[in-house]
Swiss-Prot record:
A molecular function (GO) term: metal ion binding
Location of the protein in the cell: Membrane
Recorded GO CC terms: membrane
Gene that this sequence comes from: ARSH
Annotated active site: C55 (nucleophile), H117
The EC number(s) this enzyme carries: 3.1.6.-
Topology class, membrane: Multi-pass membrane protein
The keyword Translocase appears for this protein: no
Organism field: Canis lupus familiaris (Dog)
Identification of the protein by name: Arylsulfatase H
Entry's transmembrane regions: 167-187, 189-209
Note accompanying the cofactor annotation: Binds 1 Ca(2+) ion per subunit.
Amino acid sequence: MTRNSRPNIVLLMADDLGVGDLCCYGNNTVSTPNIDRLASEGVRLTQHLAAASVCTPSRAAFLTGRYPIRSGMASPYNLNRGLTWLGGSGGLPTNETTFAKLLQHYGYRTGLIGKWHQGLSCASRNDHCYHPLNHGFDYFYGLPFGLLSDCQASRTPELHRWLRIKLWISTAVLSLVPLLLLIPKYARWFVVPWKVILTFALLAFLFFISWYSSYGFTRRWNCILMRNHEIIQQPMREERVASLMLKEALAFIDRYKRGPFLLFVSFLHVHTPLITKDKFVGHSKYGLYGDNVEEMDWMVGKILETLDQERLTNHTLVYFTSDNGGRLEVQEGEVQLGGSNGIYKGGQGMGGWEGGIRVPGIFRWPTVLQAGKVINEPTSLMDIYPTLSYIGGGMLPQDRVIDGRNLMPLLEGRVSHSDHEFLFHYCGVYLHTARWHQKDCATVWKAHYVTPKFSPDGAGACYGSGICPCSGDVTYHDPPLLFDVSRDPSETRPLNPDNEALFDSVVKKIEAAIKEHRRTLTPVPQQFSVFNTLWKPWLQPCCGTFPFCGCDKEDDILSTAW
């Protein structure tokens, strides 16, 4: 493609939106006319899959086109499955190449508005090694972390109570170690280097600070609004943030309307605490969650309206999705604050069940893609990376494995079969499930090797623990639970050798593919290690004098669109 023929690209990603929350995917209680318009004017994918069932690893895969385990963005722990502190030292490694960096190299102006949650700094609070501007974005306005219930002072804190308990126990144990080591040192029983004693003392201090900070500093230290490298609000004023993000997104389109541009709008909707403007409260039939969905849909409408007004619609590819499925366990009393995953079992945090990983996937490009088309083939969020590389007119990196596939032949109708024969579904670093789409037919087999134990039994979610674990208290299956999701998408009828003649051959084929996949994995630094996820005072972004951080540099006058 020539520079003049390459389209503008607008990527719209919701946070924790269930696939069953949209009218175009079967919901009849929440009104989403603008997202439905995208679907009616474009192509709708019905088997679109996230590479992880929680946000940080899913977004890492989206940005890089690679399974999170390849970049170290998959966790071996049940509680630390995402980045816990903005002042931690983990993040999307600098040697990973995002689609923004590719398109920037191809001559696109690139912008990210909204949630990042891929880390910020490595060694000092101002090095910003993981910052969006160091990952290919020319402009960033939003949250370098993500939205938490802690960001709204009136809400119940989101940091899990069991995480706090573990932090406290770790603090106590690590505090005892240097004290116990001092005894043999001064008794001269054996030599204990001061370096060892001080290392344990430092670790004890870091665990103590992380535990202490979880009881009141989370909002001030995690809920920060930035423009490029500058802190704009600390803590952010939650009632204003959606207004400011929309204004910035529309301004970016206006600024670079001569193109080509890439705009990634990473909504805070519909993550708790479901911050919603007064004009949308009570707007839906589904409570505050539905109100938040409808506010997001309205924001999508404003972006589409701007593209129309600037006469960019026909020359702009618009894509809408969610980072993972809706969360089932989030409640306030008897009120459900999470989304609907429709007919699919499970939800956010569950590595293999469809409800945690099946997400909306809508593409609109009026002059190229057929309006109203529906594709039932397996596709992945990782496919956006090679698709954008193709559209932008460039080449994929040749020095690494790219797990995504270019979707344009499928979207344009040049092929009818997905290029994915196998897809692997991880929960943290643990492979829970694998999917096989036979090349010669429409059948999609899915084998579960690990599934969560729901609590209470039969509840369909892990209400007792808040999120389903990836290891430990889980159910292991040998032989695996096998489903034909092309005929049984709700995964209610497990197959076995008695009711499926192909059972043994299918399982053998999938297990051979898993072995081949694992041969392609190479060891990388673990970004969710205990040390990386600990809060570190020297990495904490601060507007003002640490630890008394605070500022608001935004104008008081907001867009009249609100």
